Amino acid sequence: MNTETKSLPAWLDKVRWDDNGLVPVIAQEASTNDVLMFAWMNREALAKTVETRRAVYYSRSRKRLWFKGEESGHVQHLHEVRLDCDEDVVLLKVEQVSGIACHTGRHSCFFQKFEGNVDSGDWVAVEPVLKDPEHIYK
């Protein structure tokens, strides 16, 4: 199905889209269950993700579709799509090409861990940079 020339499929109507026509998406690595990143999708992005078997997100700042890895080469191959119990969050189980999901060059965007207590805690980077972002985005 080409989503540019045909109407979008009816199964998309089950998703509870927000007032802007978006739904939050969590990308999880299929082989390890690591949470890789959080992003947004509109109907077209979700349809293209299923159609191409590659993660396609919607950039709220650029107001356009964002094909994961279009600049970095760090694409996400789709294994499975799930919808949560309230039907307002999508989970993508993916294979992360090159092991880098984050624009900081790390495996996961969730690399900062809170350590300490409510009075004297701080966020600590607990995942290494796998590749310098300067060399990812040229």
From Swiss-Prot:
It catalyses: 1-(5-phospho-beta-D-ribosyl)-5'-AMP + H2O = 1-(5-phospho-beta-D-ribosyl)-5-[(5-phospho-beta-D-ribosylamino)methylideneamino]imidazole-4-carboxamide. It is found in: Cytoplasm. Pathway: Amino-acid biosynthesis; L-histidine biosynthesis; L-histidine from 5-phospho-alpha-D-ribose 1-diphosphate: step 3/9. InterPro entries: PRA-CH, PRib_AMP_CycHydrolase_dom, PRib_AMP_CycHydrolase_sf. Its cofactor is Mg(2+); Zn(2+). GO terms for cellular component: cytoplasm. Zn(2+) binds at residues 85, 102, 109. It is an enzyme of class 3 (hydrolase). Mg(2+) binds at residues 84, 86, 88. Keywords: Amino-acid biosynthesis, Cytoplasm, Histidine biosynthesis, Hydrolase, Magnesium, Metal-binding, Zinc. Binds 1 Mg(2+) ion per subunit. Binds 1 zinc ion per subunit. The keyword Magnesium applies. Its main location: cytoplasm. GO terms for molecular function: magnesium ion binding; phosphoribosyl-AMP cyclohydrolase activity; zinc ion binding. It comes from the Bacteria. Its EC number is 3.5.4.19. Pfam families: PRA-CH. One of its GO terms (biological process) is L-histidine biosynthetic process. Catalyzes the hydrolysis of the adenine ring of phosphoribosyl-AMP. Homodimer. PANTHER family: HISTIDINE BIOSYNTHESIS BIFUNCTIONAL PROTEIN, HISTIDINE BIOSYNTHESIS BIFUNCTIONAL PROTEIN HIS7. NCBIfam families: PRK00051.1 (NF000768). Belongs to the PRA-CH family. This is Phosphoribosyl-AMP cyclohydrolase. The lineage of its organism: Bacteria, Pseudomonadati, Pseudomonadota, Betaproteobacteria, Burkholderiales. The gene is hisI.
